[in-house]
């Protein structure tokens, strides 16, 4: 089995409804639990999480061993090393323009042979990495598989990003556009109240524009009501968060029968 799992890109390019989970806890065991719970893929969160590169690599191994695709949310300057770890996709925050999205595509894709057609990237090539099986699966085959099969998800999290959603989604090489409701609410002056009407209206515009452009529209959906509403607006990739689910379960367990037994 090759280390690089390219199934996520295929799923994002299909019309499937996908349920993902952000995990910022630096633990391969948590990744395994996400797989066993039945999520379609895991988003290892290296924007807000505390995992170093070695732990990230182990989490990618855990996902691969469990048969679950994995992407990594990371900052732009970490793209090259994250891809070399063997991530099947990357998710980049705070993309506001089509020009920025195009630059990210160039960083994710390898250069093409002179006689080939398609997106011409600028990713540096090395076959000693986990992504290439430490050389076992290097060469042109690895380059072609990576260019075709590594997913790029960009995040829009500001009014500017929402206004440019259609143009961002239209960029060749962008597989999905994810609306970040929390930062969008902050950037609109609503703190983290993304349920406020102006924020919801912006989300509706963004999701609709992405879907109309023929790309997969994603969003954080923490309740069934949110998921149903966002699906009606064009989303088909929904994400939740490990820490939120764990804390909710912990609180329920900690309360136990206190309310009824009065102790």
List each language-model region with its residue ranges.
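Conserved, mostly hydrophobic/aromatic
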Residues: 21, 34, 45, 90, ...
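Alpha-helix-loop-beta-strand connector modules within alpha/beta enzyme cores
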Residues: 53-84, 106-114, 145-147, 195-218, ...
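Glycine-rich phosphate-binding active-site loops on the catalytic face of alpha/beta enzymes
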Residues: 89-104, 177-186, 235-253
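Conserved N-terminal beta1-alpha1 strand-loop-helix module at the mouth
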Residues: 1-70, 76, 106, 152, ...
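Conserved anion-binding
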Residues: 85, 89-172, 261
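Catalytic cores of alpha/beta
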Residues: 32, 36, 72, 77-92, ...
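Hydrophobic faces of well-ordered beta-strands that scaffold small-molecule active sites
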Residues: 19-23, 42-44, 70-73, 90-92, ...
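N-terminal amphipathic alpha-helix/helix-capping segment at the start of soluble metabolic enzymes
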Residues: 1-22, 134-148, 204-205, 209-212
């Amino acid at each position: 089995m090759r280390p690089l799992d390219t199934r996520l890109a295929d799923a994002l390019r299909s019309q499937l409804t996908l349920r993902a989970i952000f995990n910022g806890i630096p633990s391969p065991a948590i990744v395994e639990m996400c797989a066993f719970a039945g999520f379609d893929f895991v988003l290892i969160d290296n924007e807000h999480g505390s995992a170093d590169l070695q732990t990230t690599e182990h989490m990618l191994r855990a996902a691969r061993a469990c048969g679950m695709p994995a992407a990594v949310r990371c900052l732009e300057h970490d793209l090259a090393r994250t891809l070399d770890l063997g991530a099947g996709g990357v998710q980049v925050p705070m993309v506001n323009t089509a020009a920025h999205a195009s630059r990210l595509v160039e960083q994710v894709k390898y250069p093409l042979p002179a006689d080939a057609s398609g997106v011409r990237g600028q990713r540096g090539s090395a076959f000693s990495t986990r992504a290439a099986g430490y050389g076992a699966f290097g060469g042109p085959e690895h380059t072609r598989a990576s260019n075709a099969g590594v997913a790029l998800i960009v995040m829009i999290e500001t009014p500017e990003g929402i206004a440019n959603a259609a143009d961002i989604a239209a960029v060749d090489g962008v597989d999905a556009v994810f609306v970040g409701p929390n930062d969008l609410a902050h950037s609109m002056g609503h703190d983290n109240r993304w349920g406020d009407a102006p924020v919801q209206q912006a989300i509706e515009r963004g999701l609709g524009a992405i879907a109309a452009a023929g790309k997969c529209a994603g969003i954080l959906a923490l309740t069934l009501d949110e998921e149903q509403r966002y699906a009606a607006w064009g989303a088909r990739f929904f994400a939740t968060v490990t820490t939120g689910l764990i804390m909710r379960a912990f609180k329920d367990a900690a309360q136990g029968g206190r309310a009824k037994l009065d102790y």
